[in-house]
Every structure is written in C-alpha cells, then in structure tokens.
C-alpha cells in the first residue's frame, strides 16, 4: 500500500495541500480568498526558485548549503550599488546579481569537482566566507528602504495579469527548469550522474562535471533571488535569509527529491515548497505558536526523509533485479 502511494507522491502531496487549505479556510474564510491565495503563492515564490536550484544539486548527490549566503551577498552588492549609483538600471542589477551568484556557485562546483571535497564541507565553508564578505562590504550596517530607489523596490511588486512580477518569476523559472531537466541532454545527464555512476561512466557522462553544472545553476538562481529578496523586503544586512537554506532543503525532501541523488521531479519540488508555504502562512492564522510551527515542520521533514529512504531501497532492489535478469539473459545466449 505504501509503495503504491510513493509511486504517486506528487498527487498525494497536492491533495494534502488542498485539504490543508480547505480545512483552514473552513475556520478562517479569509484565508481562502483569492487575494490571500495570491499573496501566499507570492510569499513562497523565492522558496520555489531556490528549491529548484537545490533540486539540481541534489540530483547529482550534492547539497548546497551556501544558497542563502549567496543570496544575501548578491543582494547586499546590488543594494549598495543602487544606493551609491541610483542611475544604474534595475535590469542591469538583476543581470549582475545573477552573474555573481553563478560565479559563487562555480567556486563551489570547482572545489567539489576538481578537489574532491564533499559538497557539504565546501558549502558550509563558503557559506561562512560569503557572510563575512557581506560584513566587510557593509561594515555591519544596513541598507534600508529609504536608501533604495523606487524602481529598485517596485519591480517585484508590479502586477501583471493580477499576479506580482515576483510570482511570474517563480512560474518562469519553474517552466524553464522543468523543460531543461526533461528535454535537454544536460538535464537528463544530471539524473544519470546522481542515480547511477556506473551507467554515467559507460555512457560518457562526467559525474563531476555534472555536479559543477548543477552548482553553477544553483548559484545563478540564488543570485537572481538576491535582488528579488532585497527589493521585496526592502532591507539588506549581514543576516538576511540566515538559515533559509534549511527551508530550501526541506522543500526538496518533502517533494520527494532524494538526497541520495538521481530521483525527483520539478512538480514534487513545487509542491514541497507550497506545502511549507501553506504551513508558514496558516499556522499563525489559527493561533499556533512559532515553537509548534517549528516542531510540525521538523516532524514533516523527518517523515519525508523516511519515505524517501524507503523509496530508495525499493529503487535499489529494482536495479539489482534488473541486473540479475540481464546476467541471466547473457548466460542463456552464451
């Protein structure tokens, strides 16, 4: 029974989200108003984008714990540029933030690929380095909303067809990553590199290079979110998004992306982020304390990890079965 549910994990998670929203809406009708649902999706948009970046790293058996620090550093840099050089257009700052994020991701990827250092060690180190650079650049100070230009602050809040631009950014990234992973050769190689290193080797896929690519893409999306976060919340300081990387990893795990690599879908990643978004928005509405919110989120994460492990064991048994069948066929032919 459980194995059947795991086969349809995204559908199950989507149903749970709908039931949660309906249950809370029955107690607080304003919670399911169109305006609040749009705002809730908008609040979750940055988490969705970052989770998609993290997903690509996890697919290759890596992990990027420096995403939030990357976001904070790129956000501080573009905020300082906007303050000192207000004539620089927002589109240029957005490109700069994305490029800086990609560079930081490339540093992570090179250290993992060329030096063979475990990803968790590399990204823990660069996380601290990036936070330290923020302190050096800002002197420990803040960049507040009154020091930011109207255009800088206005882009994520602008509305297009009833949705804020920030939400459209999340939708666009979702579609692009989905297409990339499903239809591009490099996207499919990420799955192979993390799911079956032997198969990757014999098909000419360099698993280390694929990890490098995944870190570059993760860094690119983190840098992109650097501008989005700072402009949305209208403040830049050293501890921006501190600890948010754990929410990002949690969204991936809940969505069925395996920390063992090679398993996971974009839809699951989306639902994992939305699940956390609903919890973060709903529990305060019904009067549950922040401590219980953390406990509930932690419990859900543990359950998701256990389910993922069960799925990984089942996948491993299938691989062994297929290998045994292949050997039998070869023996018969010989």
Language model regions located:
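Short loop segments and helix-boundary regions at transmembrane helix junctions
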Residues: 2-5, 58-63, 84, 102-145, ...
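Helix-loop-helix "hairpin" substructures at the membrane interface of multi-pass membrane proteins
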Residues: 88-93, 97, 103-108, 112, ...
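Structural signal for alpha-helical transmembrane segments and their membrane-water exit/capping regions
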Residues: 16-32, 135-138, 178-185
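Transmembrane alpha-helical segments in multi-pass inner-membrane proteins
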Residues: 222, 232-297
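Loop-to-transmembrane alpha-helix initiation sites
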Residues: 42, 119, 163-170, 211, ...
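Cytosolic-side transmembrane-helix boundaries in multi-pass membrane proteins
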Residues: 1-18, 202-209, 283-334
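Transmembrane helix-bundle core of multi-pass membrane transporters
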Residues: 7, 119-183, 210, 232-241, ...
């Amino acid at each position: 029974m459980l194995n059947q549910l795991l086969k349809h994990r995204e559908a199950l998670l989507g149903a749970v989200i709908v039931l949660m929203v309906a249950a809370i809406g029955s107690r607080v009708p304003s919670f399911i108003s169109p305006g609040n649902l749009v705002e809730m999706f908008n609040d979750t948009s940055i988490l969705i984008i970052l989770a998609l970046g993290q997903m690509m790293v996890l697919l290759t058996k890596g992990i990027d714990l420096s995403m939030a620090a990357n976001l904070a550093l790129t956000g501080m840099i573009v905020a300082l540029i906007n303050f000192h050089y207000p004539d620089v257009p927002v589109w240029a700052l957005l490109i700069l933030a994305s490029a800086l994020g990609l560079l930081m991701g490339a540093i992570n990827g090179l250290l993992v690929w060329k030096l063979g250092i475990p990803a968790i060690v590399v990204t823990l180190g660069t996380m601290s380095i990036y936070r330290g650079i923020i302190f050096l650049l800002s002197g420990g100070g803040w960049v507040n909303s009154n020091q930011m230009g109207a255009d800088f602050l206005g882009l994520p809040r602008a509305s297009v067809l009833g949705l804020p631009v920030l939400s459209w950014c999340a939708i666009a990234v979702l579609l692009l990553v989905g297409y990339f992973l499903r239809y591009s050769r490099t996207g499919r190689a990420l799955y192979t590199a993390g799911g079956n290193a032997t198969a990757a080797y014999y098909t000419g896929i360099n698993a280390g290079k694929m990890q490098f690519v995944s870190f570059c893409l993760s860094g690119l999306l983190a840098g992109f979110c650097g501008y989005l976060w700072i402009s949305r919340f209208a403040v830049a300081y050293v501890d921006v998004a501190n600890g948010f990387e754990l929410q990002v990893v949690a969204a991936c795990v809940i969505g069925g992306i395996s920390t063992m690599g090679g398993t996971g879908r974009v839809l699951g990643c989306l639902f994992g982020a939305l699940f956390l978004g609903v919890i973060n928005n709903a529990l305060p509405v019904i009067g549950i304390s922040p401590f219980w919110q953390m406990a509930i989120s932690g419990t859900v994460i543990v359950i998701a990890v256990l389910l993922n492990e069960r799925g990984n064991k089942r996948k491993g048994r299938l691989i062994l079965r297929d290998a045994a069948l292949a050997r039998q066929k070869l023996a018969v032919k010989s």
